[in-house]
Amino acid sequence: MDADLPYLTGLDAKVAAIVAPVLADMGFELVRVAILGRESPTVQIMADRADGTLIAIEDCEQISHAVGAVLDVEDPLPGAWTLEVSSAGIDRPLTRAKDWTRFAGHLAKAEVNIPIDGRKRFSGILLGAEDGFGRLRLEDGTEVALPLSDMRRARLVLTDELIAASAHMMRAPGGAPEEGEEDTTEAAPEGAGKSPKPGRRPARKTH
């Protein structure tokens, strides 16, 4: 499995395979695809920048137009559908192997489908990912390896350390403070960059 792609199956994986190259050409990365509903489903696309900075509402608009156009052409979904595009946010989901490595040292929560040593839910410090497993150091100091292919959900926990790290990622290139200068960059609130109106594509007509 490509460490740059989220772990998905079925129709979600099919849509991801179509969308990911489009985002890459625009300088973005696919974080998550979720298709909700059966009749007139909503296709939720979560993305971030390839350089690690969070996307803005304007980015969501651009992604929505580009992704909507290619989905119209490839037509993976029968009937009418609605497209929603949002930023991954600060306390983002961990859907790719690279996420576990990129955010190593930060607190996260994860839940697997099949119990490991009698439990499905885990909370601890990210230690990275290797060979299809994400590693956590739990509160008692023990380490656990969770199969990414069996991950039900995993996401970062909002902490002061994560907010500070996100503030650095949100800077534009060349925007870092000079040595000795106070960093006054504020982290975006949860869901920043989400575009419920501009990033929402009207349902297309049924063929």
From Swiss-Prot:
Keywords: Cytoplasm, Ribosome biogenesis. It is found in: Cytoplasm. The keyword RNA-binding does not apply. Pfam families: DUF150_C, RimP_N. CDD domains: YlxS_C. Residues 197-207 have a biased composition (Basic residues). GO terms for cellular component: cytosol. InterPro entries: Ribosome_maturation_RimP, RimP_C, RimP_C_sf, RimP_N, RimP_N_sf. GO terms for biological process: ribosomal small subunit assembly; translation. Residues 171-207 are annotated as: Disordered. Gene3D superfamilies: Ribosome maturation factor RimP, C-terminal domain, RimP-like superfamily, N-terminal. Transmembrane segments: none annotated. HAMAP family: RimP. Required for maturation of 30S ribosomal subunits. Belongs to the RimP family. This is Ribosome maturation factor RimP. It comes from Gluconacetobacter diazotrophicus (strain ATCC 49037 / DSM 5601 / CCUG 37298 / CIP 103539 / LMG 7603 / PAl5). The gene is rimP.
